[in-house]
Amino acid sequence: MQAITLLGSTGSIGTQTLDLVAQYPERFRVVGLTSYSNVTLLAEQVWRFRPQIVAIGREELLPELRSLLTGMRPLPELVAGTEGLCQVAAHPAAQRVVTGIVGCAGLLPTLAAIRAGKDIALANKETLVAGGPVVLPLVREYGVKLIPVDSEHSAIFQCLQGVPPGSLRRILLTASGGAFRDWPAEKLDQVTLADALKHPNWVMGRKITIDSATLMNKGLEVIEAHWLFGLDYDRIEVLIHPQSIVHSLIELADTSVLAQLGWPDMHLPILYGLSWPERLATPWDPLDLVKLGSLTFKAPDHRKYPCLQLAYAAGQAGGTLPAVLNAANEAAVALFLQERIRFLDIPRLLEQVCERHQVIPAPSLEDILEVDAWARQQVELLAQQAPAQVLA
């Protein structure tokens, strides 16, 4: 039986992971759970899955969590704050850690898990986008395995099983195109928050749904793929694939192309991240290609998706620039979700913050954390200035 710790148990990845734990009780048991602030749902999960250790990110919510668990015997160890998240990530009873925390907040707990020798089912792309220069050397030092959970990287990981080293020519990441794939670029200045949250294929969290609409999600995945699979950026391409059935493809040295297909449902890549190197039988409906009829692909329109080019540029520049781009994007998307800025202000803000940054070529963890905070502050400062001067 696999003992797992789940970081970000109340989010989209976390709740779907627990669905799978409940479906396969003979295969998985929960050792630790964490949430940033959803104390009510976290308490419900603790009552159901009986972990040994639980963390709440916001320390002031710890008394409420303790109150919601009154009468539980045995009571799990309750911890809080970033230190508490890291304690859960490194707990000695866990064999595999699922990182479902959204954003750069997942970096420190993931590092704690790696240093504790845990294999990582990685659903937090920002860990590698921002922290790749620090994370990958630690992965090699501690001999742990990174098993990608993002559907695209899981697809590539699956396609690479059994492929001889040195045979990979390029990666083709697929993207749905998000909420505005059928909108002309000229109409994007009319986008509302409600429009941007209508993803055509996937059910996801709010932040990643906006990232899908801007294609920044795919840009971050390009950077993540660079770190996971060791390819230069000119060997990582993006295709718009409206049906979201082909989750990604690889091209090999002999021009053979391998692809992984499946319904647009995160349960499958999460399950593979939990069970690898095994595959578990599922009760789900099989893919029906006859019913689907056709699968289509096209190149992304860079006028419509400037964030994709910003991500490629940041990845190629390297150093601290990907961390700056990621932090600025998190801050800008948060402002858009609060309806404090417009949709097209997101790429404008990102470009301005990146232009202001002096890149540190070989950053330490401290450098990454410092530029992360700096980029968020810059977004807030720019957004507070007159839109006509700053965002036009």
Curated annotation (Swiss-Prot):
So what does this thing catalyse?
2-C-methyl-D-erythritol 4-phosphate + NADP(+) = 1-deoxy-D-xylulose 5-phosphate + NADPH + H(+)
Q: Which GO terms describe its biological process?
A: isopentenyl diphosphate biosynthetic process, methylerythritol 4-phosphate pathway involved in terpenoid biosynthetic process
- Can you tell me which residues bind Mn(2+)? D150, E152, E221
What name appears for this protein in its UniProt entry? 1-deoxy-D-xylulose 5-phosphate reductoisomerase
Any keyword Acetylation? Answer: no
UniProt keywords (A-Z) are: Isoprene biosynthesis, Manganese, Metal-binding, NADP, Oxidoreductase
Any idea which positions bind NADPH? Answer: T10, G11, S12, I13, N38, N124, E126, G205
Q: What cofactors does the UniProt entry give for this protein?
A: Mg(2+); Mn(2+)
Family that this chain belongs to: Belongs to the DXR family.
Write out the residues that bind 1-deoxy-D-xylulose 5-phosphate. K125, S151, E152, S176, H199, S212, N217, K218, E221
First-tier enzyme category under EC = oxidoreductase
Recorded hits in InterPro entries, A to Z, give: DXP_reductoisomerase, DXP_reductoisomerase_C, DXP_reductoisomerase_N, DXPR_C, DXPR_C_sf, NAD(P)-bd_dom_sf
Q: Which residues form a coiled coil?
A: none
Give yes or no: UniProt keyword NADP. Answer: yes
Q: Cross-referenced Pfam families, in alphabetical order? A: DXP_redisom_C (PF08436), DXP_reductoisom (PF02670), DXPR_C (PF13288)
EC number, UniProt record: 1.1.1.267
Superkingdom of origin organism: Bacteria
